[in-house]
């Protein structure tokens, strides 16, 4: 996952993740029938564009509450640290949690420091 931004910063042992008021960019390491094509931050909500279908042609946009952002990042960190399971966050919408858990468990999101 490549994160492009300015501030504020959430830091951990893997490096720094930047949360901006304009945009995040996310990159998948491999393609699948379902893929996250973009992650945008509008200052209030995390917006995830999730393409479905055999040709990834159908776009769906999901949102998560601001309070869910750190929990989602923690899930990314956990997978990168070798965790085999992800604990869902109650503040995230069910669809966002499901999408992230699926993508993270299959190691399709990779943090680039």
Where are these regions (language model features)?
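Acidic/histidine-enriched, beta-strand-rich ligand/metal-binding domains
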Residues: 2-21, 25-113
């Amino acid at each position: 996952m490549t994160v492009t931004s300015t501030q504020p910063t959430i830091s951990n042992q893997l490096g720094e993740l930047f949360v901006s008021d304009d945009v995040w960019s996310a990159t998948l390491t491999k393609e699948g029938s379902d893929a996250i094509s973009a992650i945008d931050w509008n200052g209030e909500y995390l917006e995830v564009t999730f393409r479905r279908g055999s040709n990834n042609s159908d776009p769906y946009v999901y949102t998560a509450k601001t309070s869910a952002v750190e929990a989602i990042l923690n899930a990314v960190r956990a997978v990168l640290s070798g965790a085999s399971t992800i604990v869902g966050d109650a503040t995230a919408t069910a669809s966002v949690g499901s999408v992230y858990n699926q993508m993270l468990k299959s190691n399709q999101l990779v943090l680039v420091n």
